[in-house]
C-alpha cells in the first residue's frame, strides 16, 4: 500500500452562470486560484467541465496549467468539453502535469447530452434544444488515465450509476475517480443519491473512489465505501 495525497476543487458555479460566454475567464480563474495552495499534492482534481471553453480554445491556458502542475510534481485531472469531427461535442477529462491521457464519456444522458431520434425530435419541443445536447460518445475501450503513477478508472457524472461500466473501464485500476456537475439536481436529494452510487462502486470494486463535483458531494471514499473526507 502507498499513500496518495489528493486535493479536490469544488467551484460551486451556478448552472445559469456556468455556460455564459462572459463568465468563462472568471470561472477559469476561480479554479486556478483555488488550486494555487494545493500544488505539490499527488493529485489535484477539478470537476466535470470545469473549464467551459472548448479544448482548442483553451490551448494557452492548458499549457500553463500543465507547466505549473509539472513544476510542482502534481497531476492535474480536469474536465473540459471537446469538439468532435462530426460537429458534435465530447465530454472529456484530461490529465496535465505528472501524468497523461484523456477519457471521453461513453454513456450519455438521454435528452440532456443527446436527443434520441434526433432527426424527428430536435426542434419539435424547445426543451430538447438544451445547450451542449449534441454530444458524441467516446470509444468503448479507452486507455487508462495515468496520474502521479496511478492508473485511474474514470467515470463522468451518471456513468457511475452503472456497475458494469465502472468495472469494465480499466483492468486492475489503482483508483476509481468520478467527476460531475450536480447543479442540475438543484436542492433535491439527487446529489446525495448520486454520491451513494459512487460509494457503492468503491465497495464493489475494492478500490478507493475520488469524487469531484462542481456543486454536489465532493468526497474521498475508501475501498470499503467508508467516507474519509467530504464537502459540503
Please provide the spans of the model-predicted regions.
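Enzyme catalytic cores with a strong preference for nitrogen-chemistry domains
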Residues: 1-232
